[in-house]
């Protein structure tokens, strides 16, 4: 389990805290979304979870390992993988297989084990035939998959995805989301940062940050259906939920706690069968 207790962080002593008393957990195999307006502290928080940053005060632990203990940092970073917004920043090899082998190679593993991990990771992300290709020849979506494969080769217990679908075309976006869902089913703990609420409909919990604090921690159908409250946080709703809110504003009596379009269609069909004017 990843556990954060009363985490505070500021760059200089007299500056306002970037993180102000954050407490949270990520259990083994749990899928958690982290949302909030730009500048609220999301990326700073997750950088603390694999010891890329250290707390000013408070405790961050990964399976009982303290991120302030220099002796544990390498193991923490092996257990907690991070996929950044720009995959080019994570690709270091001349070929795809060299890049994916970089992390396991730093673990001092035997060559046969490194080759096994490279092949297994490429298979997991659906790029089995890409090993000898050069990264510069890949599309943006393929580069993101290579970055994920490099993390998987370290055999982590948790993966943090920082806006993994940003700037991707619809097909690549769906491919990345399907991969993340598959990794969750395999038992990995996932933290997913995004501004696209349609990317996180199936998470276990949604954490909302504002001004360095976690201000909401609840199920997605609770958090993502609160249209007025989300607007106050500078956030949007899933497209299906936004449609229902618009219908409600027009006087149509429909539920607004629905997140996907299939259920929206059923809700509208039910209303058409028994139309009732809403007084809300």
Swiss-Prot record:
GO terms for biological process: cobalamin biosynthetic process; cobalt ion transport. It is a peripheral membrane protein. Residues 2-236 form the ABC transporter domain. One of its GO terms (molecular function) is ATP binding. Pathway: Cofactor biosynthesis; adenosylcobalamin biosynthesis. It comes from the Bacteria. GO terms for cellular component: ATP-binding cassette (ABC) transporter complex. SUPFAM superfamilies: P-loop containing nucleoside triphosphate hydrolases. The keyword Manganese does not apply. Its main location: membrane. Keywords: ATP-binding, Cell inner membrane, Cell membrane, Cobalamin biosynthesis, Cobalt, Cobalt transport, Ion transport, Membrane, Nucleotide-binding, Translocase, Transport. It is found in: Cell inner membrane. Its EC number is 7.-.-.-. ATP binds at residues 36-43. Part of the energy-coupling factor (ECF) transporter complex CbiMNOQ involved in cobalt import. Presumably responsible for energy coupling to the transport system. Belongs to the ABC transporter superfamily. Cobalt importer (TC 3.A.1.18.1) family. Forms an energy-coupling factor (ECF) transporter complex composed of an ATP-binding protein (A component, CbiO), a transmembrane protein (T component, CbiQ) and 2 possible substrate-capture proteins (S components, CbiM and CbiN) of unknown stoichimetry. This is Cobalt import ATP-binding protein CbiO. It comes from Syntrophus aciditrophicus (strain SB). The gene is cbiO.
